[in-house]
């Protein structure tokens, strides 16, 4: 999806922490099956929430420093950031309805 920004250890601060909008970060890796199943869900959500929530993906294998800094221990993990702080965390694969509920209840 064009609505998703791929963030790295280097760009995380700029793209996520300093974002004026809430940011949903999806931590994933190539070998993670549940991450692949949920990817289309995140793409749809990123499009539907465009302008309200910024969607970002961080590959935890390529960017090992960022997830532990915010308490992510496993993948898939979704984190909603607001004003540079973690507002909410969801661990494990989620369905579209679960992700929508997660965003709406924290938004």
From Swiss-Prot:
Q: Which SUPFAM superfamilies does the UniProt entry name for this protein? A: Thioredoxin-like
> Which GO molecular function terms does the record list?
protein-disulfide reductase activity
User: What intrachain disulfides are recorded?
Assistant: 32-35
* Keyword Repeat set for record: no
Q: Which Gene3D superfamilies match?
A: Glutaredoxin (3.40.30.10)
| Keyword terms of this UniProt record | Disulfide bond, Electron transport, Redox-active center, Transport
* Thioredoxin domain mapped to chain residues: 2-107
Which GO BP terms, alphabetically? cell redox homeostasis
Entries under PROSITE patterns matching the protein: THIOREDOXIN_1, THIOREDOXIN_2
Q: Which GO terms describe its cellular component?
A: cytosol
Where are the membrane-spanning stretches? none
**What family does the database annotate?**
Belongs to the thioredoxin family.
- Please give the function described in this protein's UniProt entry: Participates in various redox reactions through the reversible oxidation of its active center dithiol to a disulfide and catalyzes dithiol-disulfide exchange reactions.
Q: What is this protein called?
A: Thioredoxin
Which lineage ranks, top first, belong to the organism behind this chain? Bacteria, Pseudomonadati, Pseudomonadota, Gammaproteobacteria, Chromatiales
């Amino acid at each position: 999806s064009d609505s998703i920004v791929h963030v790295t250890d280097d760009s995380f601060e700029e793209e996520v922490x300093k974002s004026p909008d809430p940011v949903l970060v999806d931590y994933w890796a190539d070998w993670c099956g549940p991450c692949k199943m949920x990817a289309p869900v995140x793409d749809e959500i990123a499009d539907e929430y465009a302008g309200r929530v910024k969607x970002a993906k961080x590959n935890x294998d390529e960017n090992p420093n960022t997830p532990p800094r915010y308490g992510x221990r496993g993948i898939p993990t979704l984190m909603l950031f607001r004003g540079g702080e973690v507002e909410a965390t969801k661990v494990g694969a989620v369905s579209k309805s679960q992700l929508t509920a997660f965003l709406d209840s924290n938004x």
